């Protein structure tokens, strides 16, 4: 996920493995050059990138490794559903 706020790129990366954890957790976040690198790595790995300014702002408040809070479940579920749809459609 990425967001350009006042010209400064912001990005956050989530991981979700049902067998590993109960909820998605933050694996990377940052702004500026760090955000650019997060987006670059995602593109290289062919990971879908979703833009959601409100969600990325909320995710930037989390610590790396922290599971998303309940109030973000719905927004993250929409992102995961979109990614699943894109992934299935590309097969």
Protein language model regions, located:
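Divalent-cation
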Residues: 1-91
């Amino acid at each position: 996920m990425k967001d350009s706020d006042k010209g400064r790129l912001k990005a956050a990366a989530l991981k979700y493995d049902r067998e590993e954890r109960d909820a998605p957790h933050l694996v990377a976040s940052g702004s500026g050059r760090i955000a650019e690198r997060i987006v670059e790595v995602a593109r290289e790995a062919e990971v879908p990138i979703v833009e959601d300014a409100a969600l990325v702002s909320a995710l930037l408040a989390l610590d790396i490794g922290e599971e998303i809070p309940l109030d973000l479940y719905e927004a993250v579920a929409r992102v995961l559903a979109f990614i699943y749809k894109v992934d299935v459609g590309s097969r």
